[in-house]
Amino acid sequence: MKKSMILGLAALMGVLTSCGQKAGAEAELHVIFDNPAPRTMPLSLFGEVPAELVQELGIAEGVPSSVSAVLVEKGGQQWLFDAGNGNDDSRLLPKMEELGVAAQDIDAVFITHLHGDHIGGLVKDGKAVFAQARLYVPAVELDAWMQMSGGAPQNVKEMVEAYGGRLVKFAQGDALPGGVEAMAAYGHTPGHMVYRTDDKLIVGDIMHGVALQMGHPEYCARFDMDKEKAIASRKAIVELAKAKGWTMYGMHFPTTEGIAVK
């Protein structure tokens, strides 16, 4: 597979280093921007951020972001982590095709959580887009959304119906294909998971604005459903990645490169 075009990430605070694939790494990973144009998160989404900090970080016009999915090739298998928005201008499938991977080539899709910008690309006209794939969804997450007052969101119900018996609910600690490890990182949503393959940590929505939240994890985006848990998860995952030397890849990072914490 071709390597993704490297898009640089502005220096965040001196604690980050952008880094690409390690030579000889077993898993080949590609971050795919689903959004067709550069994207920022409005600063207002993060509450009241002191003007001095805004100036220091250079984020007055918004926090650089993206809507992304992650494609991994390992051991002859093709895995997708989340599936983007599924909008008409989605870049996920076209970019996969550029990399030589068709939707029907995907063996497994792993979902971090059930927000629309992560599952919107799973279903088209009521049918599964990844027709040969098993869909792995955290049980805590799916159960929480299915039991919400007023019923499950339509896109969640469509996902369940479209994938049918190929939808696999799992709990932390369950064996997943290829040795993929799922770790609970609750707070953004009730059952948000991050995934590890080799030394690569796919962190979902741990951070929506990495330029702000990496150094200041106490700031939550409006989308975090349980802010106290989200802050705790954000701190824990970053510290874990630092301690283990794992590279983080996030669905709202503004770079196709991973980020290693120094």
Residue ranges, per PLM feature:
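Active-site neighborhood of phospho(di)ester-bond hydrolases with catalytic His/Asp-centered motifs
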Residues: L80-A83, D107-D117, Y136-P138, A184-G187, ...
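Active-site HxH/HxHxD metal-binding segment of metal-dependent hydrolases
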Residues: G84-Y163
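Metallo-beta-lactamase
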Residues: R134-A184, K229-G245
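Conserved beta-strand hairpin/beta-sheet module of binuclear metal-dependent hydrolase folds
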Residues: G24-A27, F33-E98, V194-I206
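C-terminal motif of bacterial Sec signal peptides marking the signal peptidase cleavage site
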Residues: T17-S18
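Cap/insert and terminal regions of metallo-dependent hydrolase folds
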Residues: Q21, D199, V203-K262
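Positively charged n-region of N-terminal signal peptides that target proteins for export
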Residues: M1-S4
